[in-house]
Regions:
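Beta1-alpha1 glycine-rich phosphate/pyrophosphate-binding loop at the start
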Residues: 2-79, 83, 169-213, 260
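FAD-binding core/adjacent interface of flavoenzyme oxidoreductases
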Residues: 1-7, 75-163, 260
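Short hydrophobic core segments
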Residues: 13, 99-111, 129, 238, ...
Length: 420
């Protein structure tokens, strides 16, 4: 980085899709950029569920942030947790150091929302970070190991029952992957249990799964999961969750050793740090240029920002939206530094939606264009490999998928020690 103290200082909090894109798009700007993240790696979240279900290893879906930005001379990386912002002094507080800024980009993302029941978190982990994925992998693989030695039939069935709460893309992909592990990968590996007798239950509070997709594709996904042995429960709300299973609003009790939460998210505390207006999910309400009202030097992007289409619908909290916001915020900052005309107000361009159901089936919607089944899965695979960071990761993931497709085996079935 330049030692010229006159260069504007840009601090970017969060190295997810939005924060990393903003950093890279400021490479040619006359600014000094500091990127802060609690992790030393950028994680490709769309494939985290494959780490959680033993198809991929953590290193296959992550890349060191410093390696990504190695050749960007105006950027440095600080590994720390942001704890607050002094908007008057223009300083960011972290667990390691305080940083002064001229421009601040808040890209701190979101975490799991248990809708007022945070006490459920220890029993129903969500999927946002590498550590979440490895913990879920440990839990669901250990369930089979424990079922192998338990004598009580009821306890064995509880161990072999897996509940996924939430019928969005993550929930659908998790349910399909766990079903494949039980039905295919593990079917010959145990002597006293038959993994194929496992129960995989997907619970969705709404009338259909994958609500972002056309109803025809949602129905196709439901039928595909059911053909894989997944029990699809639509229109059911979880009202209780503990170490023994879940309770539904209709009074039913489902005993399960493994519960996975994919039902909702809430933004980071960033709105509280800067005392900004926010929506019900904690996302900061922003101006058309993604700056914070009353604080033109502060921007919020990705899951940290509440952004809507012209008709009032919220922009989805997905990677493409975060990347577009990150690129746009960088353009605004660069224009201000150069004294040039600012870009037009931010408009999100939605390319489409994708979700995989299993090893050879997916649903895809790109405008009026729709795919499902094997062709959808091929398209889904190509898109995800293309957007992975690092040639090595793309090559390894492609080989793993080919091996899994041909053999039904998963090469990342190591059970680690719990950190929770």
């Amino acid at each position: 980085m330049s030692s010229d103290s006159q260069r504007p200082r840009v601090v970017i909090a969060g190295a997810g899709f939005g924060g990393l894109t903003a950093t890279k798009n400021l490479a040619k700007a006359a600014v000094d950029v500091t990127l802060i993240d609690a992790q030393n790696h950028h994680c490709f979240q769309p494939l985290l569920y494959q780490v959680a279900t033993a198809a991929l290893s953590p290193a296959d879906v992550a890349w060191p942030i410093r390696a990504i930005l190695r050749n960007q001379q105006n950027a440095r990386v600080i590994m720390a947790q942001v704890t607050g912002v002094d908007v008057e002094a223009r300083r960011v507080h972290t667990t390691e150091v305080d940083l002064a800024y001229d421009y601040l980009v808040l890209a701190t993302g979101a975490t799991h929302s248990y809708f007022g029941h945070d006490d459920w978190a220890p029993y129903a982990p969500g999927l946002k970070h590498i550590s979440d994925a490895t913990e879920i992998r440990r839990r669901f693989l250990m369930a089979f190991e424990r079922a192998e030695v338990v004598e009580d039939d009821a306890e064995r069935q509880r161990l072999l029952t897996f509940v996924i709460v939430g019928g969005g893309a993550t929930g659908v992909e998790m349910a399909g992957a766990i079903a494949e592990v039980a039905q295919r990968t593990l079917r010959h590996d145990f002597r006293h249990i038959d993994p194929r007798r496992s129960r995989i239950i997907l619970i969705e509070a709404g009338p259909r799964m994958l609500p972002a997709f056309p109803e025809s594709l949602s129905d196709y996904a439901a039928r595909s999961l059911q053909s894989m042995g997944v029990e699809v429960e639509l229109g059911h709300v979880v009202t209780g969750c503990d170490g023994r299973g879940v309770t539904l609003k209709d009074g039913r009790r489902i005993d399960a050793a493994t519960v996975i939460w994919a039902a909702g998210v809430v933004a980071s505390p960033a709105a509280n740090w800067i005392d900004a207006g926010h929506d019900r999910a904690g996302r900061i309400k922003v101006n058309p240029d993604l700056s914070v009202p009353g604080r033109p030097e502060i921007f919020a992007i990705g899951d940290t920002a509440s952004v809507t289409y012209s008709d009032g619908r919220p922009v989805p909290g997905i990677a493409p939206a975060a990347k577009q916001m990150g690129s746009y915020a960088a353009q605004v900052i660069a224009a201000r530094v150069e004294g040039s005309k600012p870009p037009s107000p931010f408009v999100y361009h939605h390319a489409g939606d994708l979700a995989t159901i299993g090893r050879k089936s997916a649903v895809v919607k790109l405008g009026v264009f729709q795919l499902k089944g094997f062709l959808g899965w091929v398209f889904w695979s190509v898109v995800h490999i293309y957007f992975l960071i690092g040639i090595r990761n793309r090559f390894v993931v492609a080989l793993n998928w080919l091996w899994s497709y041909l053999t039904f085996q998963r090469g990342a079935r190591l059970i680690g020690v719990s950190s929770r």
